[in-house]
Amino acid sequence: VWAVRGVFYRSDLGGYIDNVPGTLSLSPMSPSYPGPDTTYTEIDNAALVEDDFNDSSYQGFRLSSAMTLNDNWDLLITHIDQEINADGVFDYDPAVGDLEVKRFAPDTLEDAFTQTSMTLEGRMGTLDVLYTGSYLDRQVNQLVDYSGYGNVGNWLPYYICNYASATSPSYSACGNADVLVVLDDQNERTTHEFRIASNEMSELPFSYTAGVFIDESILKTINEYNYNGAASPEGGDSYAPYQVNCPIPGAWARDPSCRPITTRFYNDILRTEEQTSFFGEVTFPVTDKLDFMVGMRKYDMDIDFRGQSKFGFRGSNVSNGRDYDAGVHGTDLLNQSDTVTKFTASYKPDDDTLWYFTRSEGFRPGGWNRGGLLAPANPDFQSPPLTYGSDDTINTEIGVKTMLMDGSLRLNATWYNVEWTDIQVSRFDPVNVSI
């Protein structure tokens, strides 16, 4: 028996955020900037003003092929293809107006992925056998208005202002905060899972499930920060021109080409994660009405971080940056391993009622901090850690599922408590740790 199913779809969504007229210039009151004696250039967004500018569209398809190979084995293959295109932003600034923003550079998103998966399941005597695997390929390209960086960026004057003279460290004029970020992410992920489980033909006094899970993920990301509002990017007067921003020799780079002079900073990073997990659970029938289930998952993962953060400068100070393989990150993999457990007791006093208690552990993998161990501008602050560990949860749950009033009322009730420790948080602090 063979069956094929296809679903094709497209959805166009109108916007609801207005990009309204506005102007922007650097604030002479900011401690990062030269002060009121310096000339500041203003930027306006007249070319980008638009009502309901955050429209989007989704389109794609899903194809499935299911086949019964014989009395014991079935095969399912599925392929998904989807593309998202979106403009604008989906939040707003209450200080500007209800559902209104002032954006000074284009905001666009193109997000496309394909995923192919296969599931083979069957029976071998007293065992039910399952294999499932998938491959994901995703490409995301995005433009982001980064003009808000002008409010806090300590290094912005260096990039967009002019020195008063060749020997003076003060600035005579500053360009505008027209900063555009170009994001390019490539993500590949491959997963495999193989499991066996006892079935009703087993004569063992308990039932069980056991298996192995393998996960390999690759993320290649490029973020290019374009300072389009620089006062004199080509040089002029006593101010030396920008130099072409080229990759660090010997450092890992997905894109080995030199960037334009307006691309004053970029990240070209490779992150990989490989995980192998073994899992199993056993269910013991204590009585006809009471079952105990005990499970565990032992995982081991290697996490890698490579690449570079590249800065472009002026004059003889041609280039600088961070080669993460040669720096504190090194070439060693970050290894994390542990075992998490689960216990469930279930009690069925009758055919219509189930009481249960569960205690389970969970985790989220750790990783590398790109700005790890960098010295903050404020000496009272600590440097970010080089790596961060997994955060962990312990979940406790008590619940009941029952039918009442001769089956006319269903009741599901649960009490739960989650203890979450070593919580992972992110911090964007360009004033103290510029990454």
PLM features per residue range, with description:
Residues V1-A86, A112-T114, N187-E188, N199, ...:
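Transmembrane beta-barrel wall of Gram-negative outer-membrane proteins
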Residues S11-Y16, G22, Y58, N72, ...:
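Structural signature of outer-membrane beta-barrel domains
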Residues Y16-D51, D87-F104, D145-V182, E224-D268, ...:
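Solvent-exposed loop segments that connect transmembrane elements
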Residues D52-Y58, D107-F113, G175, L183-R189, ...:
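Transmembrane beta-barrel outer-membrane domains
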Residues F61, S65-L69, S337, A345-P349:
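A structural motif corresponding to the C-terminal end of an alpha-helix
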Residues T78-I80, F113-V140, N176-F313, N335, ...:
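Face-selective signature of the C-terminal outer-membrane beta-barrel domain
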Residues T119-M124, D128-Y146, K348, L354-G366, ...:
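Membrane-embedded beta-barrel scaffold of Gram-negative outer-membrane proteins
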